[in-house]
Every structure is written in C-alpha cells, then in structure tokens.
Amino acid sequence: MTDTSHLRSIREQVVQRHIAAEEDGDVAAVLRTFAPGRVSYSGDTLGGDLIGDHAVGAMLTAGLAAMSDLKIEILRLHHAEDAVITELRLASTHTADFDGIPATGRRVTYHMCAVFRFDGADLWQEAVYYDIATIKAQLTG
C-alpha cells in the first residue's frame, strides 16, 4: 500500500467513525474523531464557524435532539489533497425545536455535502453545506 493510499484509508476510517457516532447520537465519540484541541465546524447554516469542544458539542447536542434517530447514507466520497468530501443523504425525525420550529414528529430527508478537512491523518474541521429551506418545507408543509 502506498503512503497516499494508506493516508486515504486512515482518513476514510475517521470519516466513517465520525458519521457512525453522529448516527448513534454519541457527541463525545464525534468529538474524539477530531485531533486533540482542533475541533471545528463550519457552515453558513450554523451561523458561522464553531471552534472548540464546547461550541461544537453544544451544536451537536441540540441538533441531534431536534432530529432524532438520524440515519446517514454516504452517496459519494472523494479524496482531495487535504480533505475527504462526502455527498450524504440524511433522514431523521423532528422531535425538538429546530431553527424556531417546534417538534412536529415528521420524518425529514435531505442531502448534505460535508467536507472533512485533515492535516495529515488528523481531522480538524467538518464544513457542512445543505439547503435549510428543504428541511423547513418538510417540517411546515
């Protein structure tokens, strides 16, 4: 196995552990997939960058409470020089306040692009891109 393919394998395993922990609702396990002291989430729908265990953990806790029984399907995965880029399909049940919308009990499905940024084998940021209007339409329609 070449150095490049070995590094890609390690990164892909980190991404898979990260996604599995999100599906399990295990915020501590999600945070452990990041390099120590380098926890960061980015995305316009998050209101800007979130940096550190506390900020990211609070966002994940609220998000996983609002959208329970989360299922994430990796549709595509691409390796870049310093990132793993994923196209995902997410499905969950709206069980608590989400962006000002009280729990509806509705099942929602949407697509997301998640870019997992690495320094070598160390994950230091996840940047997420999704259409919040698609989610809101399913919750209010």
Q: Where in this protein do the model-derived segments appear?
A:
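C-terminal and inter-domain tail/linker signature
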Residues: 1-141
